[in-house]
Each structure stands twice: as structure tokens, then as C-alpha cells.
Amino acid sequence: MKVKKGGGGTGPGAEPVPGASNRSVEPTREPGAEAESGSESEPEPGPGPRLGPLQGKQPIGPEDVLGLQRITGDYLCSPEENIYKIDFVRFKIRDMDSGTVLFEIKKPPVSERLPINRRDLDPNAGRFVRYQFTPAFLRLRQVGATVEFTVGDKPVNNFRMIERHYFRNQLLKSFDFHFGFCIPSSKNTCEHIYDFPPLSEELISEMIRHPYETQSDSFYFVDDRLVMHNKADYSYSGTP
């Protein structure tokens, strides 16, 4: 696939590139209630996540999530709605200025994965990631995010991701990427380019002082219907 360019935002850091964390990414289960273009003023703290007007709405389309002004209180679709069996198997972030890889996550091959007792499996396992970066991460200008994913035996038309980033429930930036068409039973690789506008010193200071209050929702659509929803939160303090 071609490299796709995003619409700006706050985000990913490394001589190592300033901002790269020595732990980089820590996959976890989602905390119960933890509570990118940049804002030029310090946001007012908002209330914690809560159920919104989209909860229970079906189907959910791109215009629905583009209207959201806070992090969602829960996932807007179930794992079972991923009928296309889209599976992200590798994720890499690099600083576009230096080319340095900041971190990389890769799923082991199916043959090497441990057997799972499905009765004990968290249905939302794998849908939440916690990121840990150093303060310099907030000053990067451009980052490339490479994703590698497989699809099942159905063709995937008009595959699209909308990713919305918030600090204390104030929208910082919305990214909109189009993957296009994916043939059945294929493995696909695509790099999205995130352009990050400058953040005010006041906002950077607040985001560093309040780890994990920067959060994001990633919505994935096929033919304008929501089929996957992932969440993440972020620390820029450089410590777990």
C-alpha cells in the first residue's frame, strides 16, 4: 500500500530520538475509569468518561464519531462485529526526521502462541494499549506509523481509520486515514504519516504532569460501518 499522510496532531518521539521511552509500549487491560493539531491554551479539566449518544446506536458511521467531543465511555462495537477478521500483527513508529525506529510491536506467529482458555479470556483483551514516552516526544514534528495486518476470507472495501486524541476530555486532534481495498486472505502493510503541529508550553507542561489523561479512540470502518474500536492512553513523564 502507499504511504498515507495524516491531518496533523500531537504524538509520537529519539539520539535515541528524544522522546522515545525505554519501555516504549506497555500493552495492558484497560483501566476502569482512568481518566492530534495541538491546542494553544490549557484545557479545563472535564468530567470522566461517560456513556454518550452513540452507545447502542447501530450502525455507527464515520460522521457519528467525527462529532464526538470527548473520549468514549466504552467500546462502541463488540469484537464480534469484526466479521472481516482484520488482525493487526505488527506496529512500528519511527521519527521521520532521523528515521530512527522508536518502538515496534509484533505478534508471534500463530504456531508460537500459547493456547487460550476462552472462558477466561477478557473479550476486550488486545483492544487497549498504554504508551509511555519521555517529555521530548511531544516536540516531534512528524512520525511514521507502519501497520501490518491480515484479513479473512471476505473482501474489505473502503477500509478507513479515524483516530481522535483528547487531553482531559478536550479534543486535541482528529486523524483520518484511508487504507482502501484489501483482497481476501491477504497480508497488508501501510505507513501513515502523522504531522504534529506545535503545542503551547503550558499544554505540554500539563500533559507531562498528568500521565494517562491523554487518551485516544481509534475507529475502524468498512464501507462506512464501524467494525473495530480500540483505545489507548499516554504518559509523557518518562516513567511508568
UniProtKB/Swiss-Prot annotation:
Residues 1-12 have a biased composition (Gly residues). GO terms for biological process: endocytosis; lipoprotein transport; mitotic cytokinesis; negative regulation of caveolin-mediated endocytosis; negative regulation of clathrin-dependent endocytosis; nervous system development; visual perception. Its main location: cytoplasm. GO terms for molecular function: lipid binding. Phosphorylation suppresses its interaction with KLHL18 and down-regulates its KLHL18-mediated degradation. Phosphorylated more under light conditions than dark conditions. Dephosphorylated by calcineurin. InterPro entries: Ig_E-set (IPR014756), PDE6D_unc-119_myristoyl-bd (IPR051519), PDED_dom (IPR008015), PDED_dom_sf (IPR037036). One of its GO terms (cellular component) is spindle pole. It comes from the Eukaryota. It is found in: Cytoplasm, Cytoskeleton, Microtubule organizing center, Centrosome; Cytoplasm, Cytoskeleton, Spindle; Cytoplasm, Cytoskeleton, Spindle pole. Keywords: Cytoplasm, Cytoskeleton, Endocytosis, Lipid-binding, Phosphoprotein, Protein transport, Sensory transduction, Transport, Vision. The modification Phosphoserine is found at residues 37, 39, 41. Residues 1-62 are annotated as: Disordered. Tetradecanoate binds at residue 131. Belongs to the PDE6D/unc-119 family. PANTHER family: PROTEIN UNC-119 HOMOLOG A, RETINAL PROTEIN 4. Interacts with CABP4; in the absence of calcium. May interact with GTP-bound ARL1. Interacts with ARL2 and ARL3 (GTP-bound forms); this promotes the release of myristoylated cargo proteins. Found in a complex with ARL3, RP2 and UNC119; RP2 induces hydrolysis of GTP ARL3 in the complex, leading to the release of UNC119. Interacts with NPHP3 (when myristoylated). Interacts with CYS1 (when myristoylated). Interacts with MACIR; interaction only takes place when UNC119 is not liganded with myristoylated proteins. Interacts with ARL1 and ARL3 GTP-bound forms. Interacts with ARL2. Involved in synaptic functions in photoreceptor cells, the signal transduction in immune cells as a Src family kinase activator, endosome recycling, the uptake of bacteria and endocytosis, protein trafficking in sensory neurons and as lipid-binding chaperone with specificity for a diverse subset of myristoylated proteins. Specifically binds the myristoyl moiety of a subset of N-terminally myristoylated proteins and is required for their localization. Binds myristoylated GNAT1 and is required for G-protein localization and trafficking in sensory neurons. Adopts an immunoglobulin-like beta-sandwich fold forming a hydrophobic cavity that captures N-terminally myristoylated target peptides. Phe residues within the hydrophobic beta sandwich are required for myristate binding. This is Protein unc-119 homolog A. The lineage of its organism: Eukaryota, Metazoa, Chordata, Craniata, Vertebrata. The gene is Unc119.
